[in-house]
Swiss-Prot record:
The modification Phosphoserine is found at residues 17-18, 20. Keywords: ANK repeat, Cytoplasm, Developmental protein, Differentiation, Meiosis, Phosphoprotein, Repeat, RNA-mediated gene silencing, Spermatogenesis. This is Ankyrin repeat, SAM and basic leucine zipper domain-containing protein 1. GO terms for cellular component: pi-body. ANK repeats lie at residues 45-74, 78-107, 110-144, 148-177, 181-210, 214-243. Residues 1-25 are annotated as: Disordered. Plays a central role during spermatogenesis by repressing transposable elements and preventing their mobilization, which is essential for the germline integrity. Acts via the piRNA metabolic process, which mediates the repression of transposable elements during meiosis by forming complexes composed of piRNAs and Piwi proteins and governs the methylation and subsequent repression of transposons. Its association with pi-bodies suggests a participation in the primary piRNAs metabolic process. It comes from the Eukaryota. Coiled coil: none annotated. Residues 272-334 form the SAM domain.
Length: 475
């Protein structure tokens, strides 16, 4: 029974199989009847017991066998050492014991280091973090790459271990190293959708402009894998956190990146950090940290902030000076928008929510520009025909064009109202669908607000054109 329960444990050597019954890591029942091992067992039998003790994680028996003369750096089948196996299963207690007995933390087998093995281990991040800390404390090199030129930080970023990434960088790991395909740690994090790691790597100086072998940047990799939030984050031309911690000493960097979580063991410290959200990243980059608490209290998201009007800025207590900083930053925002000419007459069913929202935002923005332009013309238009110094064509031509504009605006208003009704219908159907997972309320509320603004803007534009038409008729 015990033997069958233990057969599912990982096998050293990356899961390789062997037809031999003696594969070096056989899992079975361990006879503990004789604990007086010094000098009583042949060396081969001691090695066999040592392998089994390692496999089941029996720390006390491992220590006893080491005391009996077993080498701490003995190699088994596949050439793995006990320390490499302990790291592969994220057994921090075994790793500590073996290191204390003098195990080589810099051992490599087939271009795979023990540190890489720990970073790619199957286990909780807490246990992996412990193992990595122990190995780094024994001078394991965080920049040694495997055969695919992947370094430990790439494995940690790929597997979503945020604290491990931070710890590796604090001990000198290169952030912008590229593997055989041109992937960096940032590219791996973007590919797998690990937003917190993306934010931390940006803070640590990751270069988001580095391209893969096929010419893709991390933002494009994120978009290709449908991680739209990370795509938008990486699309900022301005990287507000880039290089923020690069000039600090190793000790200062550790203090900045890591804060003590708890001392659950007497002589070991766990580490954690609080990641910036999108809103914090944006505000810190502009030197507007003082606005963070105010905006969070009012449940204002980054997307909401970036689409605010002047009256909303004032209403939410944002000063004119801060408004100018935000508006200037908007010009630096490279959000991929749908061009009007790119839309075919057929509905693009594959359009994403972010792309559709960008379309509505751009439509609303263009309508706002048109309203401003017409208002400027109305303001500058002479109220008396005698003040017109240049030769004009018949006013009838102008009023005719204005009538067409009014008709077009009315048609546009009708279409937008239909679009709003259609979206509302879809929303109602999704809410009534028992299999649908409800999205956050702020998202749907904000989309509805955008549609309302667009409709109001178009109606206002039509009203201005109507006034313009009356002005020409009066003249």
């Amino acid at each position: 029974m015990a033997a069958s329960a233990l057969r599912g444990l990982p096998v050293a050597g990356g899961g390789e199989s062997s037809e031999s019954e003696d594969d070096g890591w056989e899992i079975g029942y361990l006879d503990r009847t004789s604990q007086k091992l010094k000098g009583l067992l042949p060396i081969e039998e001691k090695k066999e017991k040592f392998k089994k003790a390692m496999t089941i994680g029996d720390v006390s028996l491992v220590q006893e066998l080491l005391d009996s003369g077993i080498s701490v750096d003995s190699t088994f089948q596949y050439g793995w050492t006990p320390l490499m196996y302990a790291a592969s299963v994220a057994n921090a207690e075994l790793v500590r014991v073996l290191l204390d007995r003098g195990a080589n933390a810099s051992f490599e087998k087939d271009k795979q280091s023990i540190l890489i093995t720990a970073c790619s281990a199957h286990g909780s991040e807490e246990q992996i973090l412990k193992c990595v800390e122990l190995l780094l404390s024994r001078n394991a090199d965080p920049n040694v790459a495997c055969r695919r030129l992947m370094t430990p930080i790439m494995y940690a970023a790929r597997d979503g271990h945020t604290q491990v990434v931070a710890l590796l960088v604090a001990h000198g790991a290169e952030v912008n190293t590229q593997d055989e395909n041109g992937y960096t740690a940032l590219t791996w994090a973007a590919r797998q959708g690990h937003k917190n790691i993306v934010l931390k790597l940006l803070e640590l100086g990751a270069n988001k402009m580095l391209q893969t072998k096929d010419g893709k940047m991390p933002s494009e990799i994120a978009k290709r894998n449908k991680h739209h939030e990370i795509f938008n984050l990486l699309s900022f031309t301005l990287n507000p956190l880039e290089g923020k911690l690069q000039q600090l000493t190793k000790e200062d960097t550790i203090c900045k990146i890591l804060t003590t979580d708890s001392d659950r063991e007497k002589d070991h410290i766990f580490s954690s950090y609080t990641a910036f959200g999108d809103l914090e990243v944006f505000l810190h980059g502009l030197g507007l940290e003082h606005m963070t608490d105010i905006l969070k209290e009012r449940d204002i998201t980054l997307r909401h902030l970036l689409t605010m009007r002047e009256d909303e800025f004032t209403k939410n207590g944002i000063t004119s000076k801060d408004q100018q900083k935000i508006l200037a930053a908007l010009k630096e925002l490279q959000v991929e928008e749908i061009q009007f000419g790119e839309l075919s007459e057929e509905t693009k069913l594959e359009i994403s929510g972010d792309e559709f929202l960008n379309f509505l935002l751009k439509l609303n923005k263009q309508c706002g520009h048109l309203i401003t332009a017409v208002q400027n013309v109305i303001t500058e238009l002479p109220v008396n025909s005698q003040k017109i110094t240049l030769e004009w064509a018949s006013p009838q031509n102008f009023t005719s064009v204005c009538e067409e504009l009014v008709n077009n605006v009315e048609d546009l208003s009708e279409k937008v109202c239909k679009l709003k009704d259609l979206i509302q219908k879809l929303q109602n159907e999704r809410e009534s669908d028992p299999t649908h997972i409800q999205l956050r309320e702020e998202v749907s509320t904000w989309n509805s607000r955008i549609l309302k603004r667009t409709a109001i803007t178009i109606c206002g534009f039509g009203f201005l054109l109507f006034i313009c038409k009356l002005t020409f008729q009066r003249k």
